[in-house]
Amino acid sequence: MKAIRFAGAGRPLSLETVPDPAPGPGWVVVDIEAAGLCHSDLHIMSGMDLGDLTVKSPVTLGHEGAGVISSVGEGVEDFAVGDRVGIALVTHPVEEARFAPGVGHDGAFAERELAHVSTLVRIPDGVTFAEAAVATDSVATAYHAVRAAGSVRQGATVGVVGLGGLGLNGVRIAQLLGATVYGVDINPAAHGPALEAGATACFQDTRELMAERPDVIVDFVGAPTTTGPAVESVRPGGRVVLVGLGGAVASIPVASLVMRNVQLIGSLGASKEELREVYELIARGALKPAVEEVPFAELPAAMDRLARGEVRGRLYTRPRADLRVGAGAV
């Protein structure tokens, strides 16, 4: 089968032919119908320090996968050949993150992926493979950050910093929870989609949130220009949820953090149950992830687009589509 392989930091991705996977006990093979592209893939490619996560090398990248089960291993009872499934990026409990596809074992940038049954979530009717794939991280991560880590409730005021794929989902999720939402992105072109997603207003600088004093600020960027200013801009007693890995080190105004009783919380991924809830929201039409298809053979070039900040919403690819054919609907 065809797969996009990563051989080490600083080395280009390569399209290779690799053996088809075979499921052992408790595992299944999923024919991948859609796989999302993520900034975390860029972090892996750059060799960024990911804390306790150790990236296997070489490895097939891709941690946002969805498709159809084509074979099952011994002992698999709750799923069967033909089931439509998303492969959850389970990070709660956080110890499970080391088993993430595209990190600890081969991921979704391939025609088929080996997945443990404990990571599978059925895709409801009304949810496309593309939506199901990007939801495993892009939507579920935003859902956990806003709802669980941020404890956003009806009537809250929320700032969302970074209005890319995750940020747009964060805006919509906060709005669905009954919050008044303000968006922040240095690129004015990102403001229109955020306003359409439910933001009341958008700014270019995190410090502009100071006038609103949000109860919660969710930082999907994680850069020196966002995290420190978020701590200063949130209301006294408020919380800042840090999701982005834009910088290896953040400068935090300690006096503002301590004297104003601000909580700074790191947030990684989501639970399998949260992914189920996200799928139901998409099935009901309450959430509609913005997606754009890129041909599988052009995935390395698409990653370059992502690195340059040229993507609004979320990119995905169809590894099983004919490599000679361009984009099409899923």
Per-region residue spans from a language model:
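Glycine-rich cofactor phosphate-binding loops and adjacent beta1-alpha1 units
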Residues: G150-R153, P188, G192-Q263, D322-G326, ...
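Mid-domain Rossmann-like dinucleotide-binding core that forms the NAD(H)/NADP(H) cofactor-binding site
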Residues: R84-V85, D125-R207
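Cysteine-cluster motifs in flexible loop/terminal segments that predominantly coordinate metals
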Residues: F79, A88-S118, D125
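C-terminal hydrophobic helical "lid"/dimerization subdomain
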Residues: M1, G228, L275-V330
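Rossmann-fold dehydrogenase core element
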Residues: R239, S251-E292, E310
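Residue-level marker of beta-strand positions
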Residues: E64-A66, D83-R84, R112, T157, ...
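Glycine-rich beta-strand-centered segment in the early N-terminal region that forms part
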Residues: P19-A35, D49-T91, P124-V127
